[in-house]
């Protein structure tokens, strides 16, 4: 995942550098360009794949999902509106699916992941939710029309954990019972804050995003040292 994220950041950086070099020969007097119709805030929606880096022997499966929604406020640089800074609040959610694994989220001594072939799970996932604030440094090739042109963004986001729960649907347990749901909500072992590096590259209203968490998911000594990551699609006007 680190290599994928590095590729996205590299594309963002190279795209900005290439466009800046091209503009040196054809400078625009932005004081004469009408930017009054450019929106200063936009809803940003992201959906994609969520995973864990350095997960060790923990068995995950299927397509684990991430969904993020932010209201971003965009502040163009007056001397060059192709460059801008954006910040805004929102929510970030991840759903990690496990394979033949029993997760004890409420263990007082730390989260445990135990391989279990006796219990047959139809669904078994860890769902987390964060209140987040992303900060992006952006470049757009068409600042007067934010629905078109190439766009690049790099930055970081900080989040506060608001929810953590294990949701399971059991087909058959060790006692021969099945067809029931279990939900354990407990954040005692979760790291209360997370910091992640983020990047986006795309055209028009669609872009590819990548995120890599720089902090551990669980508190030190209370769970494995896993680092969540995500990749997917972004829908936004900026």
Where are these regions (language model features)?
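Bacterial Sec-dependent N-terminal signal peptides
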Residues: 1-25, 235-238
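Residues on the lipid-exposed face of transmembrane beta-strands in outer-membrane beta-barrel proteins
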Residues: 45, 69-75, 89-91, 133-139, ...
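Short loop/turn motifs that connect adjacent beta-strands in outer-membrane beta-barrel proteins
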Residues: 21, 31-41, 76-83, 142-150, ...
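Predominantly the C-terminal beta-signal and adjacent terminal strand-loop region
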Residues: 38, 182-238
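Residues that define the transmembrane beta-barrel architecture of outer-membrane proteins
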Residues: 39-41, 61-67, 127-133, 148, ...
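Short glycine/proline- and aromatic-enriched beta-strand/turn motifs that initiate or cap beta-hairpins
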Residues: 19-74
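Extracellular/periplasm-exposed beta-strand and loop segments of Gram-negative cell-envelope proteins
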Residues: 56-62, 97-107, 111-128, 161-173, ...
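Glycine- and aromatic-enriched membrane insertion/assembly motifs of diderm outer-membrane
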Residues: 51-52, 59-117
